[in-house]
Amino acid sequence: MDPCECAKTGTCNCGGSCTCTKCSCKSCKKSCCDCCPSGCSKCASGCVCKGKTCDTSCCQ
């Protein structure tokens, strides 16, 4: 089973430790997803998890 179903459901569970919602990621990284949700500007380091959720404040 593909651990990242963002393309289908808009929700991505990465390694069971992080959830990325409202995004269009196509694959997952260990830290979370290789995308930032809408409203979260993309940063040089990508989308960084704060806690167990990637949200509009995920980018540092």
Swiss-Prot record:
Transmembrane segments: none annotated. Residues 1-28 are annotated as: Beta. Keywords: Metal-binding, Metal-thiolate cluster. One of its GO terms (molecular function) is metal ion binding. A divalent metal cation 6 binds at C36, C40, C43, C59. InterPro entries: Metalthion_dom_sf, Metalthion_dom_sf_vert, Metalthion_vert, Metalthion_vert_metal_BS. A divalent metal cation 7 binds at C49, C54, C58, C59. Gene3D superfamilies: Metallothionein Isoform II. A divalent metal cation 4 binds at C32, C33, C43, C47. A divalent metal cation 2 binds at C6, C12, C14, C25. A divalent metal cation 3 binds at C14, C18, C23, C28. Metallothioneins have a high content of cysteine residues that bind various heavy metals. Belongs to the metallothionein superfamily. Type 1 family. Class I metallothioneins contain 2 metal-binding domains: four divalent ions are chelated within cluster A of the alpha domain and are coordinated via cysteinyl thiolate bridges to 11 cysteine ligands. Cluster B, the corresponding region within the beta domain, can ligate three divalent ions to 9 cysteines. This is Metallothionein. The lineage of its organism: Eukaryota, Metazoa, Chordata, Craniata, Vertebrata. The gene is mt.
